[in-house]
Amino acid sequence: MITITEHYTPMFRRGYRMQFEKTQDCHVILYPEGMAKLNDSATFILQLVDGERTIANIIDELNERFPEAGGVNDDVKDFFAQAHAQKWITFREPA
């Protein structure tokens, strides 16, 4: 599995997108071979993926939005490693 650094900028892989699916009553990742249902945590993280924010920016925003979580740094990095392994996400490294 890839080692995630906070300086990476996550982006949805070409052909993959997130949307709310009424019939599933949740957000999903749509991709050429099908779809994956997302839980609330995955949805909050992926809603911040815009190809501009770094993982550090996403972590900061989630820590600010959910202070009661006590820090989401490792959880967010673990999630992005899994999303990358599932081929939902690619990363741009800093120049």
UniProtKB/Swiss-Prot annotation:
Keyword RNA-binding in record: no
SUBUNIT field: Monomer. Interacts with PqqE.
The keyword Cell cycle is annotated on this UniProt entry: no
Biological or metabolic pathway of the protein: Cofactor biosynthesis; pyrroloquinoline quinone biosynthesis
Entry-linked InterPro entries: PQQD, PqqD_bac, PqqD_sf
HAMAP family per record: PQQ_syn_PqqD
UniProt keywords, alphabetically: PQQ biosynthesis
Family, per entry: Belongs to the PqqD family.
A Gene Ontology BP annotation from the UniProt entry: pyrroloquinoline quinone biosynthetic process
Name recorded for this polypeptide: PqqA binding protein
Function according to Swiss-Prot or TrEMBL: Functions as a PqqA binding protein and presents PqqA to PqqE, in the pyrroloquinoline quinone (PQQ) biosynthetic pathway.
A GO molecular-function descriptor: quinone binding
